[in-house]
Amino acid sequence: MDVILIAAVTQDGFIARHSQETIKWSKDLSLFKKQTMGWPVIMGSNTFNCINSELKNREIIVMGRDDSPQKTLEKIDKEKCFIAGGGKTNARFASYLTHLYITPHPNVFGSGVSLFTGAVKEMNLVFEAILPVDKTNGIFQFQYRVN
């Protein structure tokens, strides 16, 4: 199964200013919706509380602190699923990731929630594709395979 981390990030690597932020700065919501439609989306409870209204027609799996990433993935009977944050959840699933879909935005926060919060082993990524999100503002999604 493909396990795909999907995230909008700032130029300094943050996915939010703080864990309770309702994300208004991201310009890739329509692409996120298109890519995740019909697939399981795994996220932490803070992320779920911040974007729940945007997630119709998807199987949402909200991870608790004690939930096992491996057991969660074993229960999924689909060819792919998405990991959609936050930073702690991304880090917990890092060793299972097969792909990263990252959309850098023209923002710098200086501090906030990192893409991976916690220790993550080094990943070698292989470029697969680039998709336009907002060409006028230079926003593109970069798709990588974890090697």
Annotate each predicted stretch with a short phrase:
Residues 1-147:
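Enzymes that bind and transform nitrogen-containing heteroaromatic metabolites
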